[in-house]
UniProtKB/Swiss-Prot annotation:
It catalyses: L-tryptophan + O2 = indole-3-acetamide + CO2 + H2O. SUPFAM superfamilies: FAD-linked reductases, C-terminal domain, FAD/NAD(P)-binding domain. FMN binds at S247, E267, K275, R295. The keyword Phosphoprotein does not apply. It is an enzyme of class 1 (oxidoreductase). Its cofactor is FMN. Belongs to the tryptophan 2-monooxygenase family. This is Tryptophan 2-monooxygenase. It comes from Rhizobium radiobacter (Agrobacterium tumefaciens). GO terms for molecular function: L-amino-acid oxidase activity; tryptophan 2-monooxygenase activity. InterPro entries: Amino_oxidase, FAD/NAD-bd_sf, Flavin_monoamine_oxidase, Glycosidase, Trp_2-mOase. Pathway: Plant hormone metabolism; auxin biosynthesis. The keyword Kinase does not apply.
């Protein structure tokens, strides 16, 4: 017997008008309004079912209810329904709203997910990660700006993913339902609005290991020009700063502004800046060779604070591989990688796999590890708790992996990001050559996986810039600043410090000349090798606690070598040659740098060799720079003769126009930068927090990039400098500005991981 006319009418024309919530911009209000919409829809449907069932002569509700898709009653029983959300962009939402009927809108193939748009435990980046893992489709934030709330039958097919929320093992099980129009997946659209999940901010954000943002503290102190001060009745300390690198100069400068007028800086070399060293060529002083730090990401917020303060914020993009035309040489075969395009096909698997890992994270056995992009997004949006807990899970699972073994575990496993399993050793070698954005990482494959991952999460591998004036202009300008009638540079003594010892309540500094001086406080920024071998600070526990001594003695310092060549012309522009070359021979990475873009006839600069670790160590056997240049030129000519024929110094002057440096044999450095081996991240923790340990304050404080979580980056040097200054002001009775690192409630990690 056929159903009544009312039943047929309801089955074909059940109203599906959605509730418009686009004006709601508060999460708690959106939560309430969405709940009300679901309740009203269910109540409305219940009334209709009762009415229709009463009129149905068979006593059974029509299975085409709710526009023919939503079976509320089957065999006399009500089918359970769930709430879910389809995330879409504004354009797709408009098409849905304009469609008549809405069922013809482009929703087929989309995934509904049980994460609400007012959920504050998840960020937008995590949503992108979850949707990709559930659907295999990539989304950009603009594609997820809006949502449609739906009721969906529990009989619909679904897939569940375990996504971590808390470090104690608690996970959020995220369920997705694929929407199809043909397969009678029963669902009903209820409401629509804007996605209010946490989004990244445009300002600064903290680094993952610290979860404290130093930039707002510096910004806040800009008006007063100081991070602390001493009341009139409080005596000011006599302070020594060991090392006139960027960290030591920031320490001295900030102490002077805080009112400490007895500050002496000891510098063993004849220049200031440390690893911020820009060599200017005699015949072209505007062309500079960055012998140390040369790439500066905008995410280095403290660095850019000081660059802006001293009028040096005008930066240009660094010519990293793929951002400019890049020549790749692998096993003697040449490949061209055009700027801004995909790399050659040979490299697609590793290129796509690494980028998929950044966006999608890693699915391993029982858990989805948060993607680096999602963690960065959480830092930007202020979701510190989730960022902390996600990072702790990475530490627990990968803390004892080298970068090499971590890559193997991720890309040779059952769920490789990008969907393609890498081959060994072929893809290994390709990845070593190509790297993760700033060139090949092959020489540091045995460093810790976590050490490399933190650089990515902190944003240090993105949008790297170069300083047109040369980065050593920053320490020069700090040193030339006059405070209370005396410049910082006038307080520098160019002499080596041989020993630092406790002497009752004072700290004794013994110089190479044999002279000794007593100080109330000492900040040591001279690097780990000097701390151990020259200053003899780790011989006992009179100054540092045993774990700090262990970290100083055992932290790994990376070897690095650079050789620059100033050429008569910018030959790569004259002859339309790529300005970046990556090779698997001894040259490794070659960069053509233009410091005079306004002058097409100006001199060219080529960083003909930038190597790390074993590749750098080999070059130590050829200390003569002319011989080393000839060796490198010959190696390049075998694969790229059209490029190599231009690698001769301007005016054939090897003495003035070729410069090289090996950081491992630099007696004042003992290495280029700290790079933790696997399982050694707790060394960074001991070194970084030493100055903030007020319970064990001996008057000697560590600072410098090697005492931070980001060895080799200026950011860590400035952060630790701030720590030391705050410790001195606080310990000596001064008053610090609010929001300083000493009063911050640090949320520490467990770096002694269990894997």
């Amino acid at each position: 017997m056929s159903a009544s006319p009312l039943l047929d009418n309801q089955c074909d024309h059940l109203p599906t008008k959605m509730v418009d919530l686009t004006m709601v911009d508060k999460a708690d209000e959106l939560d309430r309004r969405v709940s009300d919409a679901f309740l009203e829809r269910e109540a409305s449907r219940g009334r209709r079912i009762t009415q229709i069932s009463t009129e149905c002569s068979a006593g059974l509700a029509c299975k085409r209810l709710a526009d023919g898709r939503f079976p509320e009653i089957s065999a006399g029983g009500k089918v359970a329904v769930l709430s879910a959300y389809i995330y879409i962009g504004k354009e797709i939402l408009g098409r849905i709203l304009e469609s008549k009927p809405w069922a013809r809108a482009t929703v087929s193939g989309l995934v509904a997910i049980d994460l609400a748009p007012f959920c504050m435990d998840f960020s937008e980046a995590q949503l992108i990660q979850a949707l990709f893992l559930l659907s295999g489709k990539r989304c950009a934030p603009i594609d997820l700006s809006h949502f449609v709330a739906i009721s969906i039958s529990k009989t619909a097919g679904f897939r569940t993913l375990p996504m971590p929320l808390y470090e104690n093992g608690t996970m959020k099980c995220v369920t997705g339902f694929t929407i199809t129009l043909e397969g009678a997946v029963p669902f009903d659209m209820v409401a629509y609005g804007r996605n209010l999940m946490l989004k990244g901010s445009a300002g600064s954000f903290p680094t993952i290991d610290l979860l404290y943002d130093y930039r707002p503290f510096f910004d806040q102190c800009s008006d007063s020009g100081r991070i602390g001060f001493f009341p009139e009745d409080v005596p000011k300390p006599k302070v020594a700063v060991i090392g006139a690198g960027i960290s030591g100069l920031v320490v001295a400068n900030e102490l002077l502004h805080a009112g400490v007028d007895d500050v002496t800086i000891y510098e063993a070399s004849d220049r200031v800046g440390g690893k911020l060293w820009s060599h200017a060529f005699r015949d072209a002083p505007s062309v500079v060779a960055e012998m140390g730090a040369m790439r500066f990401p905008p995410a280095a917020f403290c660095l850019f604070f000081f660059l802006e303060r001293y009028g040096l914020s005008s930066m240009r993009p660094f010519p990293n591989p793929g951002t400019v035309d890049t020549y790749l040489v692998y096993q003697g075969v040449q490949y061209m990688w055009k700027a801004g395009q995909l790399p050659p096909k040979l490299f697609h698997r590793v290129y796509n796999g690494w980028r998929a890992f950044l966006k999608d994270g890693f699915y391993e056995r029982d858990i989805v590890l948060a993607s680096p992009v999602a963690i960065t997004q959480a830092l930007k949006s202020g979701d510190i708790r989730w960022a902390h807990d996600s990072w702790q899970i990475w530490l627990n699972r990968f803390g004892r992996e080298s970068f090499s073994s971590g890559i193997e575990r991720i890309f040779l496993g059952t769920h490789p990001p990008g969907g393609e399993t890498w081959s060994f050793p072929h893809d290994w070698d390709l990845f070593k050559l190509m790297g993760i954005g700033s060139g090949g990482f092959g020489p540091v494959f045995e460093s810790g996986f976590i050490e490399i991952l933190r650089l990515v999460i902190n944003g240090y591998e993105e949008n790297q810039r170069m300083c047109p004036e040369g980065i050593s202009e920053l320490p020069r300008r700090i040193a030339s600043e006059v405070v209370n009638g005396v410049s910082v540079s006038q307080r520098i003594c160019h002499v080596q410090v041989r020993a630092i010892q406790k002497e009752k309540t004072k700290i004794k500094i013994r110089l190479k000349s044999g002279i000794s001086e007593l100080y109330d406080k000492v900040v040591v920024t001279s690097g780990l090798a000097n701390i151990q071998l020259r200053h003899c600070l780790t011989c006992d526990t009179n100054i540092f606690q045993a774990p700090v001594n262990q970290a100083v003695d055992n932290s790994h310092m990376t070897g690095s070598s650079k050789l620059f060549l100033m050429t008569e012309r910018k030959f790569w522009l004259d002859h339309i040659l790529p300005s970046c070359v990556l090779m698997d021979g001894i040259a490794k990475a070659v960069y053509c740098l233009d410091y005079e873009p306004q002058d097409p006839n100006g001199k060219g600069l080529v960083l003909i060799s930038y190597t790390w670790e074993d590749d750098s160590h080999k070059l130590l056997a050829v200390p003569d720079k002319k011989e080393r240049l000839c060796l490198l030129r010959d190696a390049i000519s075998r694969s790229f003769p059209a490029f190599a024929q231009h690698l001769f110094p301007a005016c054939a002057d090897y003495d003035q126009n070729v410069i090289q440096h090996d950081w491992l044999t630099d007696e004042n450095a003992g290495g280029a930068f700290k790079l933790n081996r696997r399982g050694e991240d707790f060394y960074s923790e001991e070194l970084f927090f030493q100055a903030l340990d007020t319970a064990n304050d001996t008057g000697v404080y560590l600072a410098g990039c090697s005492c931070s979580f980001t060895g080799g980056w200026v950011e860590g040097a400035i952060q630790t400098a701030c720590n030391a200054v705050c410790a001195i002001i606080h310990n000596c009775g001064g008053i610090l500005a609010k929001g300083n690192p000493l009063e911050h409630s640090w949320k520490r990690y467990n770096y002694r991981t269990r894997n």
